[in-house]
């Protein structure tokens, strides 16, 4: 079906390369890139809804820096790498893990043990395993000094757009389509990932977190630039027009 299509849409240039490598007979001129969009009227810098703060319920200290992760517990999302890196975070940094829906019992047990070890080694670890409504996720993203995306692969990484739309700096691996979302040194920090050397990635990730969170002004600049980038380049109106243009040409 893919090779017979008049047009194929990939969500990033990285995904386009992957499609062409899997389907070598596919005409490259028929493979287009249209990135996923973000609704900046849904994702925006926001205080707690109706005064009900999920962070206050968790016991997060608003006077201390905090990094957040939101995602499923899978190998692809790199949660074990983030937990390992957090052992090297500066002691004042808090970590909010909104991580649930493990895809295997094995990784569920692995992450549970790793979080327990981390919490025993240092304070400021908050693990939310249940599903949260958008309003509470928006509160967490908005309050975070930085959002951390340790994925080992992402076609694009919509969660990074959600964090950026909330005016939060992003620290992310440089895999897949992530570099097409996170502008290194402008909206966040990219960390090199090599599957053959995960320990190096974890050390680099910790160093990036410590560096950015020690400079709140830079984190704030990244966050402001990230929201503007979402508005300018990832609005659904912008994405829809790109999609329509492909249909017109076909």
Put a short name on every predicted segment.
Residues 139-144:
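Short alpha-helical donor nucleotide-sugar binding micro-motif in glycosyltransferases
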Residues 44-60:
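A short helix/loop element that forms part of the nucleotide-sugar donor recognition site in Leloir-type
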Residues 169-172, 182:
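Short hydrophobic beta-strand element within catalytic cores of glycosyltransferases
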Residues 9, 61-77, 83-86, 96-98:
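Conserved donor-binding/catalytic core segment of Leloir-type glycosyltransferases
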Residues 108-135:
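Nucleotide-activated donor-binding/catalytic signature segment of Leloir-type glycosyltransferases, i.e.
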Residues 152:
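Aromatic "clamp/platform" in nucleotide-sugar-dependent glycosyltransferases that forms part
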Residues 14, 37:
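Carbohydrate-associated surface elements
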